[in-house]
Amino acid sequence: MPPRPRFDRRAPVRELPNINERIKYPQLRVVDSDGKQLGVIDRLKALEIANQRELDLVLVSEKANPPVCRIMDYGKYKFEQEKKAKEARKKSHQTEVKEVKMRYKIDKHDYDVRIGQATKFLKSGDKVKCTVIFRGREIQHSNLAETLLLKMASDLEEQSEVQQKPKREGRNMIMFLSPRKSPLIKKDNE
């Protein structure tokens, strides 16, 4: 008995588009390349019209009764669809959770650096996880860590909103910030 192959070596079956002779419906509602309705025509007549114009007959909506076809240049149509999909992929930004770690006894300059990092992450559209790490007996001072995280939230309130308030998680205290959809406008009390 020969050994079985480890994976399927056959080429994947690609679904071919319903164009020209691959359309099997006898009656079709045909739309011109300009968007003008040509009415319900039998398939052979629609193919003849498309061939005269040196264009393709493309099935647009299979579920309609009768199915809707459009006379167009399929190569150009396919190129436009790929271009739109590429643009959509480029515009969609996967939001990540970036982490900013610190101790509750943090120096002013180090705190400013963490604020700068968090601001950069928020401007790029990512969520920020602010973590205060406790070592040894420091965990007794969790109220100081909570104060620090709330101060950080107030310093970043123009760019972010608190998604999760400060809470203890093991030997850490965490808080989540997410970027604001619209910038916060500060009111001057004078």
Swiss-Prot record:
It comes from the Bacteria. GO terms for molecular function: ribosome binding; translation initiation factor activity. Belongs to the IF-3 family. It is found in: Cytoplasm. The gene is infC. InterPro entries: T_IF-3_C_sf (IPR036788), T_IF-3_N_sf (IPR036787), Translation_initiation_fac3_CS (IPR019813), Translation_initiation_fac_3 (IPR001288), Translation_initiation_fac_3_C (IPR019815), Translation_initiation_fac_3_N (IPR019814). This is Translation initiation factor IF-3. It comes from Prochlorococcus marinus (strain MIT 9215). It holds the Pfam family IF3_C.
